[in-house]
Amino acid sequence: MKAGPLQLGVVPPANRAIAILDFFLRPIAIVGTLASAIAMATTNQTLPFFSQFIRFRAKFNDLPSFTFFVVASSIVSAYLILSLGFSILHIAKSNLVNSRVLLLLLDTAAMGLLMAGSAAATAIVQLAHKGNNKVNWFAICQQYNSFCKRVSGSLIGSYAGVVVLILLILLSGVALSRR
């Protein structure tokens, strides 16, 4: 009976290509999540009211959903930076199963956390843009235009990170199924 490539210790080229793609997708997710956390955390706008001495200020930490978004995005960014080591390890040794399963589970948890933070922030951004007439919550984006634009922009990077994490989860699944 002839030995297969895994029995000989040879890494199949398809698994190596998946590991390389995994390594290149992680920095993209890092940039998206880290940029969105920084953009949200540095968002504020001050408006004068009647005179220069009375001002209203809008900051991201005025709303707990935005604070949760920043914390969730920061945690996911830190995880993605730390997971680059496993990604490099999989390029060198593509037949490691336990670390691939661990990455699959942690990527799924990170995607869930990032999606929860993004969804919470999206709900508040929707209220800021549209308001809610039934409970007399008025839209504030006409007054705090730059605040709303910056907050909305930070959501784009976060959702891009969610999409990349979904791709990473799929890649891990494909790599595990080829075993």
UniProtKB/Swiss-Prot annotation:
Which regions span the lipid bilayer? 18-38, 68-88, 101-121, 155-175
Q: Name one GO cellular component term.
A: plasma membrane
The cellular location(s) given in this protein's UniProt record come to: Cell membrane
Q: Does the keyword Cell membrane apply?
A: yes
Query: What InterPro entries does this protein's entry cite?
Result: CASP/CASPL, CASP_dom, CASPL
Residue positions the entry lists as glycosylated = 44
Query: Subunit composition?
Result: Homodimer and heterodimers.
Q: What does this protein do?
A: Regulates membrane-cell wall junctions and localized cell wall deposition. Required for establishment of the Casparian strip membrane domain (CSD) and the subsequent formation of Casparian strips, a cell wall modification of the root endodermis that determines an apoplastic barrier between the intraorganismal apoplasm and the extraorganismal apoplasm and prevents lateral diffusion.
Name this polypeptide is given: Casparian strip membrane protein 1
Q: Which organism is it from?
A: Lactuca sativa (Garden lettuce)
